[in-house]
Amino acid sequence: MGKSYPTVSPDYQKAIEKAKRKLRGFIAEKKCAPLILRLAWHSAGTFDSKTKTGGPFGTIKHQAELAHGANNGLDIAVRLLEPIKEQFPIVSYADFYQLAGVVAVEITGGPEVPFHPGREDKPEPPPEGRLPDATKGSDHLRDVFGKAMGLSDQDIVALSGGHTIGAAHKERSGFEGPWTSNPLIFDNSYFTELLTGEKDGLLQLPSDKALLTDSVFRPLVEKYAADEDVFFADYAEAHLKLSELGFAEA
C-alpha cells in the first residue's frame, strides 16, 4: 500500500532538522539510545489495523498509557526528552518521538531510517495489552506484529534485531541483562549471539528463542547473522513501516 505524505511548512521542516541535531547530541551524551528507541517502538506498536486505533501519534506522553505494564520505565524517556521538545513547540509529539527513535538507531552505528514528518497528535491513548509479551512464542509474535500491525515475518525478525542495543531491567520487564556484549552499538550481534546459544551475563528472552525454532524465522536469523548489510537494509525498512503505522495511508 502506497503512502501519501502530508506537506509540512518550511518552518516545520526546519524545526525537524534542528530537533534532529539536538537529539543526536543529547542521546549520545546521555547514552540513552536504547531507552529512546523503546519509547518510539512502544508508541507505534499499539496500532491495530482493524480499528485503525493506536499507533505513533504521541499518546505515550499521557500518564494513562505510561501506566501500561509494558511501558514500565518509559516515563524516564518522556521526561528526558521534554526539555528538547519544549524548544520546538511547532513539532508534534508524534513526530518528535519517532524522530528520536530514528536518531537513536543512527547514532549507535545503525542504518539511516527514512523519516517523513506530518503525524498529528491524537488525544486518546489505546487500550492496554497490544504490545508483544516477551514470555511468548512465534504465534504470539505473528498475532501482534502480523495480524494487528500488518507487518511481515521478515519485519518481525529484523525488528527483533533492535535488541542489539540496550538491556532488560528486572523492575521494568521482569528480565535482567543485555542481549549483546556491547549494548550501545547497533550491529548484527543480536543474531550471532542468538545462534551461539546462552551465555553468562547475556539475555535471551522466550520471544528471542522462538526465532530459532520457527521454520520461517530461523533462516532470517541465520541470514542476518551472516550479513550485517542485509540486516541493516531490512531493519531500516521494518522500522520505517513501524514508525508510520496508521500514518499517511493512501
From Swiss-Prot:
Heme b binds at residue 163. Its EC number is 1.11.1.11. The active site is at 42 (proton acceptor). GO terms for molecular function: heme binding; L-ascorbate peroxidase activity; metal ion binding. CDD domains: ascorbate_peroxidase (cd00691). The record marks 38 as: Transition state stabilizer. Keywords: Calcium, Cytoplasm, Heme, Hydrogen peroxide, Iron, Metal-binding, Oxidoreductase, Peroxidase, Potassium, Stress response. Residues 117-137 have a biased composition (Basic and acidic residues). It catalyses: L-ascorbate + H2O2 = L-dehydroascorbate + 2 H2O. Its main location: cytoplasm. One of its GO terms (biological process) is cellular response to oxidative stress. Binds 1 heme b (iron(II)-protoporphyrin IX) group per subunit. Residues 113-137 are annotated as: Disordered. PANTHER family: L-ASCORBATE PEROXIDASE 2, CYTOSOLIC, THYLAKOID LUMENAL 29 KDA PROTEIN, CHLOROPLASTIC-RELATED. Plays a key role in hydrogen peroxide removal. Belongs to the peroxidase family. Ascorbate peroxidase subfamily. Binds one cation per subunit; probably K(+), but might also be Ca(2+). This is L-ascorbate peroxidase, cytosolic.
